[in-house]
Amino acid sequence: METVAAIKTLIQQLAQSTDQFGRAEINDALRELQYSLETPFDTVMRMSLDTCQVAVARIGSDLGLFKHLSQCASPQSAEELADHLGCGRELMSRLLRYMASVRMVQQTDDIKYISSNITQTLAVPGLEAGMRHAFENLWPVLMALPDFLAERKYPDIVDAKDTAFQKAFNTDQDCFHWLATQPTRIANFKVLLTDERTPNFLSTFPLEKELGSWSAEPEKALFVDIGGGMGHACIRLREKYPNQPGRVILQDLPPVLQAAQATLPLSGIESMPHNFHTPQPVQGAKFYFLRLILRDFPDHQALEILQNIVPAMDAESRIVIDDGVPPEKGARWAETGTDICIMSALGSKERTQRQWEELAAKAGLQLQALYQYTWPVVNAAMVFSLQ
């Protein structure tokens, strides 16, 4: 199989010589090739057994395997790992054998184990929390989705209190209110929110251009981060533009702001308790910023959030929506998969540019600019003004 080895080497060389967009294209091509070469049996086995990955990853996370193995200086045997982590030796051997088959770990020629890129990924707290959140909070919802839809004769899901989430967890509350009563389930979600991803909207957002002739008076707000969580956007803005005048305000619920105080700088960023389901108190700010907020709500609730901001705007104000913008055609699996998940749990959706513009128009807003900052999965800062 020298030809296969040569092709593999060529692909690795191509991946090393290109950017993230090129690597994504290579991944897509390889995935499409894999699917096209599968036998019917291969296809069914893949669909049936892919579910093992998150379950086994969760077990590895519970054991602390990924953190431990990523710190080991030499290959470890299954017995050594089992004894160190408090696991049955045969169980550890079987777990590692599966993990090696999907590259969660790497198996050496002498049947020992070292970390892989996936091991390193699952050792990062924010990314590990994302996997655990998916297992604990999303998997049960997706398992309930087929029966939920069949029982209702396959309607559109547009109500946050009438989704597969309620069926999965036997509750009449929406996802966020129910999770707030479940400290063990929401813990990983909170850690996930602290993960600071790069690149971010400031990678391509032309602040000076968007400021135009706007001039900051002492009490005038430059940037209001609505539902801004731990304040990452505010911090990044102040770090990149330390001399830019104007107030930078982080808004969220009081418990969130209390948690954020540990990471916020001592000066330059104000904390303001605010629920975005109520009218916006800061008048005439230049930028009202919403990052990954509206995707969590069905259209009617997302519209209400925008309508709570519009009365506070003046002619120079802009609402900046930082969110996913999947294409109408050729959306990638990560975008379409996210869409199915948030539909099932929240009654919401990933919106195309057309859908964002239609939603904003109902609130009296119009799109002025769109600045994409991730490829090929599209995340972008969309700038809206009053009509």
Swiss-Prot record:
Residue positions binding substrate: 135-148
Source superkingdom: Eukaryota
Single GO term (MF): O-methyltransferase activity
Record-level GO BP terms: methylation; secondary metabolite biosynthetic process
**InterPro entries, per the entry:** COMT-like, O_MeTrfase_dom, Plant_O-MeTrfase_dimerisation, SAM-dependent_MTases_sf, WH-like_DNA-bd_sf, WH_DNA-bd_sf
Listed binding positions for S-adenosyl-L-methionine are: 227-228, 252, 275-276, 291
Role description: O-methyltransferase; part of the gene cluster 23 that mediates the biosynthesis of a family of 2-pyridones known as leporins. The hybrid PKS-NRPS synthetase lepA and the enoyl reductase lepG are responsible for fusion of phenylalanine with a hexaketide and subsequent release of the stable tetramic acid precursor, pre-leporin C. Because lepA lacks a designated enoylreductase (ER) domain, the required activity is provided the enoyl reductase lepG. It is possible that the dehydrogenase lepF also participates in production of pre-leporin C.
Q: Which family does it belong to?
A: Belongs to the class I-like SAM-binding methyltransferase superfamily. Cation-independent O-methyltransferase family.
Identify this protein by name.
O-methyltransferase lepI
Organism from which the protein derives: Aspergillus flavus (strain ATCC 200026 / FGSC A1120 / IAM 13836 / NRRL 3357 / JCM 12722 / SRRC 167)
